[in-house]
Amino acid sequence: MNRLLVLLALLAVPQPVPTDWRTAPSSDWRELFDGKTLDGWVVKLAHHELGDNYGDTFRVENGVIRVMYDKYGDFGARFGHLFYKQKLSHYVLALEYRFFGEQVKGGPSYAKLNSGVMVHSQAPETILKDQDWPISVEAQFLAGGRTTMNVCTPGTEIFMKGEMVKAHCTNSTSKIYGNDEWVAVEVEVLGSERVRHLIDGQSVLQYEKPMIGGGVANGFDPAIKKDGTVLDSGYIGLQAESQPVEFRNIRLLNLSGCSKPGSPAYRAYFVHADDTRCTTR
């Protein structure tokens, strides 16, 4: 059989089409926060070494992760992130957030009622001590009469409808939420192909082809910021930007996995093949 016939034979075999990830059973979702500890997470605050949780900025109280500043005098530009330790490429991240309390003294005006979650972030161990923002893409959480689940791009660029977005932040189409209201959000990340922001299961923003580039991030290692590098994977990080905020019900659905339908580890909603997972869940 010549190569053409082999190719035609392969093309004739029906290929499984991924189903919507909303069909995934709840047991397939992984809890990233155990409600008791910050196990599996690492803190990085600007002007502090990796792992230095100055002032207990990130803490666990009453089953939620809280960003608190009661042990601070002044904010001191200590922009912070709590990173999950696993690198990810194709997934859905779900969580709930709520603002509370007053912004700490010295926090910038734009950071009032402002937080977010970073995706496709550089590895936390590559963030320099005095670096303000990780090179990443941010799903931005806002209150105070503003839309939420916007997108911001510290050290990155994104595309919408085939055009590079020039603005650092772009608003979503969300409704306005109360200042202290719990908001349930999801970020669907499909490698470098697409990122989608959802609230209560409804899409409010979508963009494509995230890559390293642009400004805003400062104090980074030039060896890390290689402009034009397409981002197809990275880390997630919860943000501490001077406003007290709570996070809960942090869950992950991996969309990368076994592509062989005969394997117990196969899932019809997988969109990216990783056949090293065919013997495990």
Predicted regions and their residues:
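N-terminal export signals
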Residues: 12-13, 275
